[in-house]
């Protein structure tokens, strides 16, 4: 390259200074992410440099006087350009740091439609199982943050609720077992009562059967006793008839004796009527007086003894045998009467025992029926008690679930408030960061 005045290829110092300044400004503008724009600017700088060279060829000798000064100033400008280039390199390296990238990223993100700053997209795509999509807005990120906080709170609650749920499940599982135990106890009590009722019923039936047997035996004994009474009555009637016949015979004998005595007296009177001696008369009178005395005595005796069995027996022939037979009859009848009295007493005792057996039988049968009813009531009472215990257990479980739900609600409210506070803090921090970047 020549100047046109001197004909040499030495450059113009002023032009070199101008080009150096343009290069410095171009290198300063080329920092950051827009490398293509910086390259385009560099090309523009080169094009302007060539234009300046072409313009410099036409200037000629107007610049000849200042050539030495320009040469000196060009050397100083070269030194400054080298120092500017090193400064530009250090600035470019500083632009690659994380802080610079964050600042440029925030500047490049722009704003939302409502004027708030748009948060940068996260580098990861999943956090604790929650998928993060690119291009999510601020509200979506806040919702995800709240979800993550809720999940963290749920994990912290699960450890405390697991023990409570285990206890509740054990209580729910034990409720039917308690009910079954109460039902079993009630069934055993009812079975014991039923056995007692069956025993009482069997005892009652046995007593009734014994009463029937005793009644049958009593009827047979009474029949035999009535037969004995009829025999005794027949014997008594026979004795009365015999006494009447004996009395009639005694009267007949007395009448016969009187007739004989009268006939003898008449015969004696007729026989001695013709005797003349005083001895015969005296004997006849004596005989008559004796006959009259005997007749009176017999008549009086017969009339006095006609009303009793003993007098009649004495006035009858073989009265001692008759008296002996009468005593035997009395003895026999007395023995029979004693036996009958013993039988009557025994029958009375048997009747008392039979009545007692009948009462015990009725009591046993009624007790058996009532015992069966009591057993049924005991079984029903056991069922009701078992159901009541199960309902108590279920009520306790429901109360525990209600308490657990209340605790969960309170803790959820606390977690929600904590999440809101966290989001508020994040929002305030984002606003402060945005304000600091743009101010």
From Swiss-Prot:
Superkingdom: Bacteria
Region (Disordered): 1-127
Transmembrane segments: none
Composition-biased stretches (Low complexity): 79-102
Cross-referenced InterPro entries: BipB-like_C
Biased composition (Polar residues): 110-126
Family per similarity comment: Belongs to the chlamydial CPn_0808/CT_579/TC_0868 family.
The name this protein goes by in its record: Protein CT_579
């Amino acid at each position: 390259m020549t100047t046109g005045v001197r004909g040499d290829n030495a450059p113009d110092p002023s032009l070199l200074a101008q080009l150096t300044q343009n290069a410095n400004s171009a290198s300063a503008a080329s920092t950051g992410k827009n490398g293509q724009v910086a390259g385009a600017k560099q090309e523009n700088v080169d094009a302007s440099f060539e234009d300046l060279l072409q313009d410099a060829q036409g200037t000629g000798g107007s610049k000849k006087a200042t050539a030495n000064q320009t040469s000196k100033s060009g050397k100083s400008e070269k030194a400054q350009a080298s120092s500017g280039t090193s400064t530009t390199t250090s600035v470019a390296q500083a632009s690659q740091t994380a802080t610079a990238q964050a600042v440029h990223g925030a500047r490049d993100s722009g704003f939302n439609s409502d004027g708030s700053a748009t948060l940068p997209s996260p580098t990861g795509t999943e956090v604790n199982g929650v998928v993060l999509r690119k291009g999510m807005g601020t509200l979506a990120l806040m919702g995800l943050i709240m979800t993550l906080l809720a999940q963290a709170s749920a994990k912290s609650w699960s450890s405390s609720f697991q023990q409570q749920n285990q206890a509740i499940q054990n209580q729910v599982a034990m409720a039917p077992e308690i009910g079954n135990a109460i039902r079993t106890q009630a069934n055993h009590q009812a079975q014991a009562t039923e056995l007692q009722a069956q025993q009482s019923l069997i005892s009652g039936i046995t007593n009734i059967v014994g009463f029937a047997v005793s009644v049958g035996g009593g009827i047979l004994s009474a029949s035999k006793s009535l037969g004995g009474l009829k025999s005794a009555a027949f014997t008594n009637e026979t004795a009365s008839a015999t006494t009447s016949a004996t009395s009639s015979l005694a009267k007949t004998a007395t009448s016969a004796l009187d007739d004989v005595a009268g006939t003898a007296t008449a015969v004696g009177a007729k026989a001695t009527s013709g005797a003349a001696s005083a001895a015969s008369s005296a004997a006849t009178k004596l005989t008559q007086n004796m006959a009259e005395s005997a007749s009176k005595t017999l008549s009086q005796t017969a009339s006095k003894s006609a009303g009793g069995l003993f007098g009649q027996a004495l006035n009858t022939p073989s009265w001692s045998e008759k008296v002996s037979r009468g005593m035997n009859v009395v003895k026999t009848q007395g023995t029979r009467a004693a036996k009958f009295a013993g039988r009557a007493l025994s029958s009375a005792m048997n009747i008392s025992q039979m009545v007692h057996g009948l009462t015990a039988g009725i009591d046993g049968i009624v007790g058996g029926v009532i015992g069966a009813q009591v057993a049924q009531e005991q079984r029903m009472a056991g069922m009701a008690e078992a159901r009541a215990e199960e309902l108590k257990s279920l009520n306790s479980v429901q109360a525990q679930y209600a308490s657990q739900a209340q605790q969960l609600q309170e803790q959820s409210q606390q977690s929600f408030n904590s999440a809101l506070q966290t989001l508020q803090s994040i929002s305030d921090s984002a606003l402060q960061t945005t304000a600091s970047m743009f101010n």
